[in-house]
Amino acid sequence: MASADRQMIGDATLAYDPRAKQKAAAKLARIPIKVEPGERLKKPDWIRVKAASPGTRFDDIKRILREHRLHTVCEEASCPNIGECFGKGTATFMIMGDKCTRRCPFCDVGHGRPDPLDQDEPMNLARTVAALALEYVVITSVDRDDLRDGGSGHFVDCIQSIRKLSPQTRIEILVPDFRGRDDRALAILQAAPPDVMNHNLETAPRLYPQARPGSDYRFSLNLLKKFKALHPTVPTKSGIMVGLGETDEEILQVMRDMRAHGIEMLTIGQYLAPSSSHLPVRRYVHPDDFRMFEQEAYRMGFSHAAVGAMVRSSYHADRQAQAAGLHVNAPK
């Protein structure tokens, strides 16, 4: 095997199989930047993860997902809120497989050569949403740079299938940046626009080369601005992680940039490193600072800001949308 097909992980040299799903060290071994480990910070008292309580729907949700061959970002990205969300019968569905074409060193979703799209996935997803009687659904995806439309057509198929079986269900999509395909993707999404359009900026532009290699801060901002121009009544949303080495002023500037590009809903949460191979946590932001970000968000004119250590983009997304003025029926 050629040397280009081998990678170093620690002191071992392993064969590289692009078809296999790579996680942690295996995933990050081939990125052009070096992840520099930092001092391991002690987790403060205000970082608390809620486990699933006995008698909740946690096991039922996992069983239904496996039966319908569905993935969730909750599982694939090792979200700390999975116990609480699954326990309450909610999940963020991740479509188009579990292998991402990007290798962002903050993210725990696996990397690899993606499998062909599952043509049954939209209807399997719709049946699952109907079976769980979900009133609000968040659909996200891995990056699919291998697809000519970036996967936008598959998003449309999923939205249309859900609306066919569950016409009252509100749908939020958390999309990738459709790098180089944004105009085509936005044109395709016009066939079935979501109820909320979400795309995360993730961090300050200074940190993009380290945190989001292959992505562009201005490109991401303009994706949401272009969508808003096409669908002025659909709320746009974006999220930021803190703790990657940014300053408070950089976060405030990202928020100003969001508002300048018409973004109405905001999430800010604490970055927690999935493993020692990922980007290290550079700081734990104090609750008082989160409150400051929240106050500033409303001063800037955001319709809703979910801000706190354990906040994630789709955490209590139904409540976020409702607080922003989108009508969401009470859960059945």
From Swiss-Prot:
Record CDD domains: Radical_SAM
Cellular component annotations (GO), alphabetically ordered: cytoplasm
Domain Radical SAM core residues, every copy: 85-303
EC number: 2.8.1.8
Manner of cofactor binding, per the entry note: Binds 2 [4Fe-4S] clusters per subunit. One cluster is coordinated with 3 cysteines and an exchangeable S-adenosyl-L-methionine.
List of residues binding [4Fe-4S] cluster 1: C74, C79, C85, S314
Any Pfam family: LIAS_N
Top-rank EC class of the record's enzyme: transferase
UniProtKB keywords: 4Fe-4S, Cytoplasm, Iron, Iron-sulfur, Metal-binding, S-adenosyl-L-methionine, Transferase
Cell compartment(s), UniProt: Cytoplasm
UniProt cofactor(s): [4Fe-4S] cluster
Chief localisation class: cytoplasm
Reactions catalysed, as given in the entry: [[Fe-S] cluster scaffold protein carrying a second [4Fe-4S](2+) cluster] + N(6)-octanoyl-L-lysyl-[protein] + 2 oxidized [2Fe-2S]-[ferredoxin] + 2 S-adenosyl-L-methionine + 4 H(+) = [[Fe-S] cluster scaffold protein] + N(6)-[(R)-dihydrolipoyl]-L-lysyl-[protein] + 4 Fe(3+) + 2 hydrogen sulfide + 2 5'-deoxyadenosine + 2 L-methionine + 2 reduced [2Fe-2S]-[ferredoxin]
InterPro entries assigned to the protein according to its UniProt record, in alphabetical order: Aldolase_TIM, Elp3/MiaA/NifB-like_rSAM, LIAS_N, Lipoyl_synth, rSAM
GO molecular function, one term: metal ion binding
Pathway(s) per entry: Protein modification; protein lipoylation via endogenous pathway; protein N(6)-(lipoyl)lysine from octanoyl-[acyl-carrier-protein]: step 2/2
Binding sites annotated in the UniProt record for [4Fe-4S] cluster 2: C100, C104, C107
Homology family: Belongs to the radical SAM superfamily. Lipoyl synthase family.
Classification via PANTHER family: LIPOYL SYNTHASE, LIPOYL SYNTHASE, MITOCHONDRIAL
Official protein name in the record: Lipoyl synthase
Species annotation: Verminephrobacter eiseniae (strain EF01-2)
